[in-house]
């Protein structure tokens, strides 16, 4: 599997480089970084104490010409540029970027008519199994329980609520036969009035080096149920991304997520 990594100098990029180098079936063939990055020209393996001969570059076409797959955990504007390059070079994509606008999501979906793409806000096995648990719980706590989603991430995260929190909200709303767009409440401030019993609330915490904590609270009268997932490192995301690459190796064009990859549908 000839794999290139986008955002190679970032926290997730470094973890992905290490995961690819440690996988006997994978070959690192490219490492992309943003224009102007101080790491351009550095060996991609330097982050993990290995010499790979692969230099960090901002030359999209040079990298895509060598790769069969790109793993992308960057930012929406960067991912859109990567999608355009992937279309030019017929490269399959594993995308963990969050914070897309509706227009950007439409571009991604259009590209999937020609490319195999796995797009998931969270690629850990644990989170995706948790989504199934939430669907089950929502069906049984559909009356008399208020639903709130609380997430916490490191101080550098730029979007809120997290993509994973939104995935959880969509799983719960879907199980209840609702549209998340119609029932989501993002943060509360001032005099908000009494809680709408059909709403799904979101709260976001940012601080320190928290990798990612997510709790879905079902609050009833006399009891409350909390379903929580906590990430202690990004290793689970990297392993999930490689699992997604393997999944795409046997697929043609189409838009998939980790529920497809893990056979949870």
Swiss-Prot record:
The gene is dapB. One of its GO terms (biological process) is lysine biosynthetic process via diaminopimelate. The active site is at residues 153, 157. This is 4-hydroxy-tetrahydrodipicolinate reductase. Disulfide bonds: none annotated. It comes from Burkholderia vietnamiensis (strain G4 / LMG 22486) (Burkholderia cepacia (strain R1808)). Its main location: cytoplasm. The keyword Oxidoreductase applies. One of its GO terms (molecular function) is NAD binding. The keyword Amino-acid biosynthesis applies. It catalyses: (S)-2,3,4,5-tetrahydrodipicolinate + NAD(+) + H2O = (2S,4S)-4-hydroxy-2,3,4,5-tetrahydrodipicolinate + NADH + H(+); (S)-2,3,4,5-tetrahydrodipicolinate + NADP(+) + H2O = (2S,4S)-4-hydroxy-2,3,4,5-tetrahydrodipicolinate + NADPH + H(+). InterPro entries: DapB_C, DapB_N, DapB_N_CS, DHDPR_bac, NAD(P)-bd_dom_sf. NAD(+) binds at residues 7-12, 33, 96-98, 120-123. NADP(+) binds at residue 34. It is found in: Cytoplasm. PROSITE patterns: DAPB. Its EC number is 1.17.1.8. One of its GO terms (cellular component) is cytosol. NCBIfam families: dapB. Belongs to the DapB family. (S)-2,3,4,5-tetrahydrodipicolinate binds at residues 154, 163-164. Catalyzes the conversion of 4-hydroxy-tetrahydrodipicolinate (HTPA) to tetrahydrodipicolinate.
């Amino acid at each position: 599997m000839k794999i290139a990594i986008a955002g190679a100098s970032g926290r997730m990029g470094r973890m992905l480089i290490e995961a690819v180098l440690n996988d006997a079936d994978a070959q690192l063939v490219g490492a992309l970084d943003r224009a102007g990055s101080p790491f351009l020209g550095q060996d991609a393996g330097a982050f993990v104490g290995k010499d790979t001969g692969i230099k960090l570059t901002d030359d999209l076409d040079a990298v895509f010409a060598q790769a069969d797959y790109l793993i992308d955990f960057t930012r929406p504007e960067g991912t859109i540029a990567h999608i355009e390059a992937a279309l030019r070079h017929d490269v399959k994509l594993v995308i963990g970027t969050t914070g897309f606008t509706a227009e950007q999501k439409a571009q991604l979906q259009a590209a999937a008519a020609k490319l195999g793409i796995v797009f998931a806000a969270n690629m850990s096995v644990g989170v995706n199994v948790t989504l199934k648990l939430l669907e089950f719980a929502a069906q049984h706590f559909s009356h008399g329980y208020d639903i709130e989603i609380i997430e916490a991430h490191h101080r550098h995260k730029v979007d809120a609520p997290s993509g994973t929190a939104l995935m959880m909200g969509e799983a719960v709303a879907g199980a209840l036969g609702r549209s998340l767009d119609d029932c989501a409440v993002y943060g509360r401030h001032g005099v908000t009035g009494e809680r709408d019993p059909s709403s799904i609330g979101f709260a976001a915490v940012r601080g320190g080096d928290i990798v990612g904590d997510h709790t879905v609270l079902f609050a009833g009268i006399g009891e409350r149920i909390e379903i929580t997932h906590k990430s202690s490192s990004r290793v689970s995301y990297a392993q999930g991304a490689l699992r997604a690459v393997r999944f795409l190796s046997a697929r043609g064009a189409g838009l998939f997520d980790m529920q497809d990859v893990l056979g949870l549908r």
